[in-house]
Amino acid sequence: PVDGDWGDLLRSASRHIGWTKPVPAGRGRGLAFGMKSCVPATESSARIRLRVDGSVVAYVGTSEMGQGAFLSFAQLVGDWLGVDPANVEVVMADTDVVPFDTLTASSRSLVHMGNALQAAAEDVKRQLAARPHGRQQGDIIGVGSFAAPPDPRHPLGGRTPFFEAVATAVELSVDAETGHVEIHKLVHVTDAGKVINRSRSSGLDDGGVVMGLGLALSERLEYGDKGLANGSSLDYRIPTVADIPTDTTSRFQENGDGPGPHGSKGIAEGGVLAVAPAIAEALFQCTGLRFREIPFTPERIWRKTNGR
């Protein structure tokens, strides 16, 4: 489903970059939009155990790899069952004990596994309510699952449950003598539907933006006669803390229109999408030249600006 307000994303990014203000001498501004779909035709299942002592165990097939699924799931389950998230244990990934999950990828876990956990939590509450006076005589186990609605018109038998839509704006300058690009300000806006864990979500988007900076300005594989020539961390140029603009802002559009819990959508992977085209447009505004090949390295910029 194509949802959200894409125009509002662009307006928000342009407003916070100061698009209508005069551009300082020697600088250029760029604004770009990006969108990606979530992988279609996948399924997630979850199981929740409510123990007699009031603690909760949630079993999920999701793998935690820094995206914050562990914290988000504990927060959601605690909210649905009325318990402190600190009393929610999340058991992940061990296929000997957790229900089926198609994969951990494509920013899908919050929507797919989140909905499966919500169904499992509702199952727990139904069972608890059916007992006399709500008394619990033993552990209660609830199960739930979620799958994107099938659509036979699509070649893979399904459709994406949501899109990641983002807008990025930058302000930069170019050193005429070296071709070095300095980004003075960067604003990134994501349509999150509804943010579940704000601090973790901001960190995820910031990380995606930094990956986008590497894609745009420095990262490429160099091959020589003996194969890959820059295959080490010493030679492959990823962004460092010194490369990140000090004035970097990640913001969220929250319309509550996503298919996940509380109207949420998956985020973070989209952070990469619009950085390079925004920088390309800012380079054009700054130099009057179109750069159509990434990364925009100092050498490439110097050669083009000097007619080489």
Task: Go through the PLM ranges and name each one.
Residues A58-M65, N255-V275:
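Extended, non-catalytic structural segments that build the interaction scaffolds
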